Each structure stands twice: as C-alpha cells, then as structure tokens.
Amino acid sequence: MRFSAVAGRYARALLNVAIEKEKEEEYLRFLDLVCQIYESSRELFDNPILKPEKKISLIKEIMKSFGQEMDEFQERFLTLVFERKRQKLLRNIRDLFEYEKILSEQKVPANLSIAHSPEDEELSLLRKFVRKYALKDPVFDISIDESLIAGALVEFEGFRLDTTVQGRLKRIAREALKRGEMS
C-alpha cells in the first residue's frame, strides 16, 4: 500500500493531540469507526452537494447509534478532512496513525505471514529475533497464508526473514535455473 504525504500530516497531527490527551487507543478506535462509516456509504460522503457540516452530523448520529461520542478535536479533525475534500484519504490516515502510534511507543511494526495460526511459542521466538536486530519490541501484523505451506515470513525495517517452504522452493528453483540444470 502506498501512503500519501498529506495523509501522514493529518495522522501525525491527530496522534499529537491523542498523545497529549493520553487517548491514543480511543482515537484509533474513532478512526476505525469513521473509516467503516465512510466506506459503507462512500457515494453519500463523496457527494459534493452535501455540505461538510451535514456529513459530519451524519457521522455523529451513526456513532451515537454505536454508543460512541466524538470529542471536539475529533470533530474539528473531521471538519478539516471534509472541508478540504480529503475524505478519500481516511483509510490511509488511519493506517498511518496506527504506524506512527507504534513508533511513538518505541516499538517496531512487523509484518508476519504464516501458514497457520501462530502459537505463543512461535510468536515468542519471532519477537526475540526481531528484538535482536531492531533493538525494539515488535508489533506484529499477522496474516495467514496457507500457500506458504509451512514456516514464517517476517518483514520489518526493510529486513526480510523467509523460513517458508514456498520461499525455499523458489530459491532452489532460482539456483537451478542459474546453473542451467532446469530447462
């Protein structure tokens, strides 16, 4: 996924407010809910005829139906986003907010692809590995991919560890092609 520089500025600004108010998790849940609301009715929220104030009041009403309230900073944030017609960046802003939040906690985001649901022991070993090289605790974004057959693929800070059967088979095939053993 490509991230927008504009989305990064919005995400960092909102994160700064969240850190100041000590409500990082609450603001992340707020962004999750706003993204779900926006994505479920994209045509409505992208309609140029509707005023930004009306769009925000609709979001407020929907949030109330879920038992959620919006504070003044969240409302001002949404006002800026909708007035400047940046609502299409909401998912990007949410993802960057989460990424920046992890970095602000002195942790490292890491992608973990694994063929099955990971057990605690496996996660512990992978945490130790990432800690050894990144010198920070990892926050795993876990995805299950059965095509890997077995093993795990970990990516963090530009580093990639591939212990999957699929990865090994690809390396063997690549080496065989280099040597001219396969035609």
Curated annotation (Swiss-Prot):
**Annotated compartments:** Cell inner membrane
Kindly state which keywords UniProt assigns to this record, in alphabetical order.
ATP synthesis, Cell inner membrane, Cell membrane, CF(1), Hydrogen ion transport, Ion transport, Membrane, Transport
A Gene Ontology cellular-component term: plasma membrane
Q: Which GO terms describe its biological process?
A: proton motive force-driven ATP synthesis
The record ties this protein, via PANTHER family, to: ATP SYNTHASE DELTA CHAIN (PTHR11910)
Pfam families xref list: OSCP (PF00213)
Q: What does this protein do?
A: F(1)F(0) ATP synthase produces ATP from ADP in the presence of a proton or sodium gradient. F-type ATPases consist of two structural domains, F(1) containing the extramembraneous catalytic core and F(0) containing the membrane proton channel, linked together by a central stalk and a peripheral stalk. During catalysis, ATP synthesis in the catalytic domain of F(1) is coupled via a rotary mechanism of the central stalk subunits to proton translocation.
Name-wise, this protein is: ATP synthase subunit delta
Encoding gene per record:
atpH
